[in-house]
């Protein structure tokens, strides 16, 4: 259900297509973001279920937030809705900044 930032980086580097889904709020996304991600705030996930389902048919969804709590909740909910091709990035964007890309601001 979870994947580390290092695993995400390796999968992207190998050429695997992934959809990186940021479930933080727009203000958080403005503060710090990862390149080529799609912002779908947690509160809007149910309204975007069909879009997420279509995306998951095309490639795995990697869901992230600030520290990994909200994203894990979203992944659990998506799986309850029948979308299995999704994982939460453990530690969120904060861990990504610490381990992968220090140019991403930490807050």
What are these regions (language model features)?
Residues 1-18, 26-60, 69-107:
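Rhodanese-like catalytic fold shared by cysteine-dependent sulfurtransferases
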């Amino acid at each position: 259900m979870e994947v580390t930032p290092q695993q995400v980086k390796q999968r992207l580097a190998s050429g695997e297509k992934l959809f990186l889904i940021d479930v933080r709020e727009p203000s958080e996304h403005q503060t710090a973001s990862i390149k080529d991600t799609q912002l779908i705030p947690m509160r809007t996930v149910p309204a975007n279920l069909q879009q997420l389902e279509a995306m998951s048919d095309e490639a795995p969804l990697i869901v992230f937030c600030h520290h990994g709590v909200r994203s894990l909740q979203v992944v659990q909910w998506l799986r309850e809705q029948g979308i299995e091709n999704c994982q939460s990035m453990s530690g969120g964007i904060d861990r990504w900044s610490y381990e992968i890309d220090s140019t991403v601001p930490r807050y």
